[in-house]
């Protein structure tokens, strides 16, 4: 290291008077010292103040320029040297060198800038101000078609530099996207897919950029899907495939790219992986099976890509996915159920699947997961059943297949996601199905659980769905027995609270259910309606200008129904409802105006 001190002293003198011969020798000594002990040599270089002199040596004409850039690249491998490089004013001359025609100068300059930018806000900022990114992208564009090893090496360095420049920095990534880096990199990948290092750089760059929403449109306008699938088919190593997966997952969130990936044959690749890995317990294989099946489900989230794979229920992909449901592999059961839930996003598909026995498969799957079951599988299978129950023609078929009995086995679940889907499935099944609604509504165990979940303040979804199912049981059954069961279980107060929901649809469902209670079974419910302050709430809803027309209408229908109770009617009189109702006679909505006239007559006659 004494040698190094001498070299640094000598370098100071020769750098000042630019003695080319001895300068080259000093630079060679420095490179040698850096190769032996980079960190220690870098510290000495920093302490010597030589960095400031390097700025003057970085000139396009000088023969030693590439070596100086090489030294900067080496010292910038150390985190503690990056800010000193910026402070020494090296960025601007380095960026100027990007205009050089000399390939070695370009290579070392790209390395130096890339290393200075690595994890360094100051480095990136300086390169940004000097306009380095655009010059590098222009180089990549012009070099793209060249396949000689030197050009490929240079492109690899430039890709690495752009990656270090923009990594985890949204604004710099957005800048690269606006400079058109994406089409350039996609083209690069297509031409140089045989070059492992360059391919890897492109994939890492895509992985970074694909997270940005603004990148998706640019990606969609290239043939990225085709290139990635082509590359994927060639890969045998787990790590390489994983790198491609990391790009595919964020890209596949875009519907246009989903379709492109399906058309490029990605699904066939994924199905093949599933087949290869399904029986393996090796950690890598289990991880790859999960990634492949998750990605498969993601592709089905796009309407067009989903329909393309469904192929009227005759598609080979759809058939393969069906075979996952009875499998013994939890990951495949989960992916299969989620895939069915996605296929069940339109009525035609739902009807076809129910007619072809999917319900029985899902019920069998749920039966396997009742005791200490897998929560994610329960959730996915219930999601699928809920979606399948939406078309009117499916409801009776699913009810006679015994879906409600299977679903009710999960009433004891303490997992909010499962509770939420269970409630949604039952609500869909009883829609306009009076007999089923009555049967469920008389099930005291179910109603008690609903009342309990109506108080699940920590889980708004479960709370909302419980309220909606309580209301639906009354609305679809119109049964006195159902109302009695709900009164006995303490459900009335929740329906009254539901009438104050911020969602009009829920308010309306509550008011219709309450009107049926008042019309069919007012006596037993009277006390609960009073203590829940129903009359005061109705007054507020009618007086509030923001209430939707249907809310005003159903509130007045309910007021009329409540007149059958002496105590509730007294509350109505005490609150001067006439004033509020008479104002509504001139309401712009005809139904509201008519109901206001009727209600006013009833109030006048009764008083």
Swiss-Prot record:
GO terms for cellular component: cytosol; endoplasmic reticulum; extracellular space; mitochondrion; nucleus. Keywords: Acetylation, Cytoplasm, Endoplasmic reticulum, Guanine-nucleotide releasing factor, Mitochondrion, Nucleus, Repeat. GO terms for biological process: angiotensin-activated signaling pathway involved in heart process; CAAX-box protein maturation; cardiac muscle hypertrophy; myosin filament assembly; negative regulation of endoplasmic reticulum calcium ion concentration; positive regulation of mitochondrial calcium ion concentration; protein localization to nucleus; regulation of ERK5 cascade. It is found in: Cytoplasm, Cytosol; Endoplasmic reticulum; Mitochondrion; Nucleus. Disulfide bonds: none annotated. This is Rap1 GTPase-GDP dissociation stimulator 1. The keyword Endoplasmic reticulum applies. One of its GO terms (molecular function) is GTPase regulator activity. Serotonylated on Gln residues by TGM2 in response to hypoxia, leading to its inactivation. InterPro entries: ARM-like (IPR011989), ARM-type_fold (IPR016024), Armadillo (IPR000225), RAP1GDS1 (IPR040144). ARM repeats lie at residues 89-131, 170-211, 347-390, 391-431, 479-519. The modification N6-acetyllysine is found at residue 230. Interacts with RABL3. Interacts with RHOT1. PROSITE patterns: ARM_REPEAT. Acts as a GEF (guanine nucleotide exchange factor) for the Rho family of small GTP-binding proteins (G proteins) that stimulates the dissociation of GDP to enable subsequent binding of GTP. Additionally, appears to chaperone the processing and/or trafficking of small GTPases containing a C-terminal polybasic region independently of GEF activity. Targets include RAP1A/RAP1B, RHOA, RHOB, RHOC, RAC1 and KRAS. Regulates mitochondrial dynamics by controlling RHOT function to promote mitochondrial fission during high calcium conditions. Residues 122-170 are annotated as: Prevents binding to prenylated RHOA.
